[in-house]
Amino acid sequence: AGFNTVRMSWVNATLPQDLERFDPVVEAAARHGVKIILANHTNEPGHGPQDNWGAQQKNGLWYDLGGASDGTDGGGNRGTTTDARFLEDWVTVARHYAGTDTVIGFDLRNEPLAIRGGSTWGTGDPKTDIRLMYERVGNAILAVNPQVLIIAEGPQNYRGSAAGVGPAPWGDLSLAERAPVRLTVPDRLVYSVHDYPPYVSGARPAGGPAKVAAMNRTWGYLVSRGIAPVWIGEMGANFDGSYENETVAESRVWAKTLVDYLNGRLGDQGGPTFRGPEQGVSTNWWLWGYRPGEQLVGTLDATGALRPAQLAVYRQLRQHA
């Protein structure tokens, strides 16, 4: 088991410090042939239980000052990032890493939320339509760094979906065919979703035909019909029942269904299929490492060894030809 790409997150309010942290990592990655994807995680630092430790920005938007924002990030922090600053910060990042082939992708916003007052898709409202943000920011990035991939996450939608085809807790891309992200440079767009078992996501069923049908409707059709690539920007599970309310059986069902789907084994249920050396749907495991006291989904134990349950799932992924 191994990996060839690392996803690292940054915050608008701490961008200068984040770039200082990233630079030596990018240099080390270049020496080892590992690629980097940078993701904007939240606008503000300083998270706690009130906003699930910053797992997502609770106002559901990509900015927290002006526009549709109430002047906070929705999690108790005063807002400092306007829509304009959000774009400017991404252009700063793009310029900083222009000319290196190690930083290959920019994940424009981590886990936007399709909550009331949060992100929408295809509404045409520049204050909330995240598709329009992806176009504005993506094209501004490509103007200074045309080689990089622009990664556009579907808003996590627990209530329904933009196309009215059922909830999309992993990310709602149900309108991405009818209302696509339009970039000025071809072949640079990658859509993305995040998928976790119920003890993390709260989404049920964990797997099986109903889960497959929901994925087909909300993002899988993009791959099945060759419309656009989709990347699973985060996935992972603990598999031992030691964290929060994990049910190990549910996590195993989740993993079986998702891995089969990503590998093209569920074509008889409408999922993507792949032939011969074709690559399956690419993924990013959260997290590759060990955090003392926070072994939510990490792949390593305290000794640095791969945890068997994670390895058993990870090694099945059809990640390369």
Can you name each region flagged by the protein language model?
Residues 44-56, 115-117, 200-201, 293-294:
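Short acidic/His/Gly/Ser-rich catalytic and metal-binding motifs that mark active-site loops
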Residues 36, 231, 284:
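Conserved Rossmann-like nucleotide-binding pocket used by diverse enzymes
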Residues 87-91, 95-105, 109-279, 301, ...:
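Extracellular glycoside hydrolase catalytic/binding regions
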Residues 15, 46, 158-160, 239-240, ...:
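Generic structural signal for helix capping and beta-alpha/helix-loop junctions
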Residues 1-6, 10, 14-108, 129-142:
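An active-site-proximal structural segment forming one wall of the substrate-binding cleft
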